């Protein structure tokens, strides 16, 4: 046996349909396209979304809202999380890098600090955004806020 003698299994390869080659072929005449009409003619292609004259789905369904391409999404981190993180690692400065290292946020996400929970230690917190109450709570505890 060698590569030049290999053949596909019996019945595995079908011969292609040769249409429009005269009446003797069995596929002449209308060439499997039926009689007349746009679909029988060359160059025919129906419009995308065309449903045979029925009102298409994109016009039947009501239209709601849109996706704002300028939307900025922040990953929320609560003050209680910052407090537990600072206690566990004895940190006084918490940056986005610390949150990434702790597995709380992914590398490319923007971070917003929210005021759920309390902060008892003086922390310097770096983040992309802060809620007003979170900012006040951090400053009240003797810490500071750094917006990136």
From Swiss-Prot:
The keyword Lyase does not apply. InterPro entries: Ribosomal_uL15, Ribosomal_uL15/eL18, Ribosomal_uL15/eL18_sf, Ribosomal_uL15_bac-type, Ribosomal_uL15_CS. Residues 1-51 are annotated as: Disordered. Pfam families: Ribosomal_L27A (PF00828). It comes from the Bacteria. One of its GO terms (molecular function) is rRNA binding. SUPFAM superfamilies: Ribosomal proteins L15p and L18e. Residues 21-31 have a biased composition (Gly residues). The keyword Glycoprotein does not apply. GO terms for cellular component: cytosolic large ribosomal subunit. This is Large ribosomal subunit protein uL15.
């Amino acid at each position: 046996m060698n590569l030049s003698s290999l053949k596909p299994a019996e019945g595995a390869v079908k011969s292609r349909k040769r249409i429009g080659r005269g009446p003797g072929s069995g596929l002449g005449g209308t060439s499997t396209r039926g009689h007349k009409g746009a679909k029988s003619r060359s160059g025919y292609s129906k419009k995308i979304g065309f449903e045979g004259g029925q009102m298409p789905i994109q016009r039947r369904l009501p239209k709601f809202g849109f996706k704002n391409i300028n939307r900025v999404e922040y990953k929320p981190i609560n003050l209680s999380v910052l407090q537990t993180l600072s206690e566990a690692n004895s940190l006084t400065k918490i940056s986005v890098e610390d949150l990434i290292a702790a597995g709380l946020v992914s590398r490319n996400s923007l971070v917003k600090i929210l005021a759920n929970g309390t902060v008892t230690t003086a922390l310097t917190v770096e983040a992309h955004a802060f809620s007003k109450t979170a900012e006040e709570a951090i400053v009240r505890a003797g810490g500071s806020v750094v917006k990136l």
